[in-house]
Amino acid sequence: MKFFRHHKLISVALVGAAALTLTGLINPAHAADGGDKKSLSVSAKAPINTMDSSLNTDAYGAQSLNNTMEGLYRYTGQKLKPAVAQSIAKPTNDGKRYTIDLKKTKWSNGDPVTANDFVYAWQRMVDPKTGSQYSYIYSGIKNADAIVAGKKKPTELGIKALGPYKLQIDLDHPIPFFDTLMSSSQFYPLNKKVVEKLGDQYGLSSKGMVFNGPYKLQNWKVGDTEWTDVKNDSYWNAKNVKLNKVKYYTIADPNTGLNLYDTNVLDRYQNLNGDTARQLANSKEFGTDPSNSTYYLELNQKKIPALKNQKLRQAMSLTINRKDLANIILGKTGIPAHSLVPSKMSKDPQTGQDFTKTDQALADQKYTAYNPTLAKKLWQEGMKETGQKELNLTFTADNTDTTKKLAEYLQNNMEKDLPGLKLTISSVPFKTRLQREASGEFDMSTSAWNADYPDPTNFLDLATTGNPQNNGKYSNKAFDQQEKAATTTNANNPAARWQNMQNAQHILTQDQGIIPMYQDTTASLTKPGVCGFNITPTGQYDMAAVYKK
């Protein structure tokens, strides 16, 4: 799921001054738990673009959907538990059929949540008329690929209601990560009556919407920088939701954020980075959470044919000192990434070895090791092979100070080490950057992906030919074959599947078809007494578990 760094950097001098005020942050007189223990205020990473689970593509909308909706299963911290489903179902028919009994739960307007709500939502998701960029995530569910391609009707999708509270799901082939997939927002139910009444305005405002999760979104419309979630008393597990209200503030400037935190407007200030994080790292209220998200560069090989040259892409990657980028530019809130797949997310089912620490993965780090001398050599060879004397690229990046500094760092390194390359930075809002990527109107861009489910294929699939999220149009038949085998032929063979994914990662890393930069960590300031911020494998927080002492 698309992701970006939102908060701005401030100068060392300003951060130093702000840090002096942080002595008040740990003063009991300032403690947040002295106020309303049923209300919480936190900073938001970005405004919500849509609350339509069929159309959302970014991690920020996913967090809000996770707060207010739920599907068959739900992550509580790192543990997957039944949500609308009565239990975690076991597959039959050689792993290709799931029969799932549902709890008798309700929407926030009192309507029952039924099996048909799932059928409607899923069929809507794969219907080409909906225009979902995420319809590909249904691949493997019976007939999904054919429906997305317009070859079959949405009603032929492998899901049907066997009764008001019983679902049958049929697959084309086993999906090893099916259970975790069912926690994703793309598989949430929808109230057909509400969606059709609101039409193309559905998800653009909280007015008229209904929710089946722990909270309800109130008084929100697209473009708002503040919004409120209130406890959903109709939620089946409402008795275990400790907070009555969660207030979100989108904060662009760290000075503003620190001031709001210091004056107790915020209970939690999230997504610190750069100088801010570095200067506040010793505060007792500072903490970090790992995140299964990778930040990378996309090169538009369709618009700029020269970028199809492997040597040019390899050269660009070798100019990046990922250690300096993580430590200096990001203030140690990032980890150097040598592959698109995040570290500590997936383990070999037989040996327990991390996906990014195998012998092959470690050997492939030579393709991402800082080596300006080799970069220049490869660049000159690639330029000769493509008949280029110079290459002028527009570098699209988010218009936050952190990303601006990152873009300038890459610009300086690449122009210095790669003769004939000129990068012109175009800093634009997050939403504009996503639009440019989706329409192909970019040469080179910073992008990121946050796990929808903790499996290497969720990241590797981004580079498959024809994937809607493959904005750079990288294509390699051998890579595609390995990915296809991992998700189809060898789906029920853990050892063979693991090797397929390792092979795919090797091909992509060698090609630098997508150039990984760093893996994100989430740095935050949290008031004493605020508890339960447990991150899930998909990088979200289960706000139903958060409470104040």
Located regions from the model:
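N-terminal lobe/hinge region of extracytoplasmic solute-binding protein
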Residues: 43-93, 210
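Detector for C-terminal structural segments
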Residues: 319-352, 401-411, 438-549
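Ligand-site clamp/hinge motif
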Residues: 233-279
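Surface-exposed binding/hinge segments that line
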Residues: 135-193
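Aromatic- and charge-enriched surface segment that lines or borders ligand/interaction sites
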Residues: 86-134, 263, 306
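Gly/Pro-rich hinge or "lid" segments in bacterial periplasmic/extracellular proteins
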Residues: 59, 174-241, 245, 255
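Structural transition elements
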Residues: 336-381, 402-404
